[in-house]
From Swiss-Prot:
Membrane side Cytoplasmic: residue ranges: 1-13, 76-90, 210-221
Membrane-spanning segments: 14-34, 55-75, 91-111, 189-209
InterPro entries the UniProt entry points to: Tetraspanin/Peripherin (IPR018499), Tetraspanin_animals (IPR000301), Tetraspanin_CS (IPR018503), Tetraspanin_EC2_sf (IPR008952)
UniProt keyword annotation of Glycoprotein present: yes
Record-linked Pfam families: Tetraspanin
Tissues and organs where the protein is expressed, per its UniProt entry: Expression is restricted to the nervous system.
Family: Belongs to the tetraspanin (TM4SF) family.
Top-level lineage group: Eukaryota
Function: May play a role in signalling in oligodendrocytes in the early stages of their terminal differentiation into myelin-forming glia and may also function in stabilizing the mature sheath.
The encoding gene: Tspan2
Protein name, entry field: Tetraspanin-2
An annotated GO cellular component: plasma membrane
Residues bearing attached sugar chains per UniProt: N139
Amino acid sequence: MGRFRGGLRCIKYLLLGFNLLFWLAGSAVIAFGLWFRFGGTIKDLSSEEKSPEYFYVGLYVLVGAGALMMAVGFFGCCGAMRESQCVLGSFFTCLLVIFAAEVTTGVFAFIGKDVAIRHVQSMYEEAYSDYVRDRGRGNGTLITFHSAFQCCGKESSEQVQPTCPKELPGHKNCIDKIETIISVKLQLIGIVGIGIAGLTIFGMIFSMVLCCAIRNSRDVI
C-alpha cells in the first residue's frame, strides 16, 4: 500500500512538473506567434490590400493553441492536486484538442509553403509590372516588399531603383529572397507546431496513468 501511494505521488508530481512546463511553453508559443504576425516581414506585408490571409492561418491557430495551453496547464495542476478523475479526464480531452491543432499547424506550414511562396511572388511580380508601366502605380507596394525582404528588383534593380532601400548593399533578387525567407519562417512554424504536439503526448500519458492510479487506489481502499 505504501509503495502504491508513493508511486501515485510520484506520478502526480510528474504531471505537476509537466503542467508547469506546458504553461511556460504556451506563453512562449503566444509570444512566438505574435512576433511572427506583427513583427518584421509579416507585419509589412499585412498592410497590403492583396496580402494573402491564408498565409496567417497557421499563426492564428498557433496563438490560439498557445492560449489554450496556458489555460490547460493551470487546469491540469488543479486536477493533479485534487486527484480528481473528472478534471483529469477533461484535461486529457483538452490536450487532445491542442494536439490536433498543433499537428494541423505543422502540416499546414509544411504543405502550404510552396503555395504561400508562389502567391507572394505573384504579388511582387504584379507590383513590379505596374511600377514599370506607370511609376505612380505599385510604388508603395514595391517599397513595402523591398523594405520587408531587404531586396531590390528581379534580375536587375535598374528599373525600380528609386523604391529600393538606401542601406541595401548591392543587388538582391526579390524573387529569390521571398522564397528563402518565407520557406524558413514556415518551416520554423511547422517545427514549433509538431514539437508542441509531441509534448502534449507526454501530458496525455501522465494524465491517464494518474487517473487510472487514482481509481485503483480507491478500489483498494
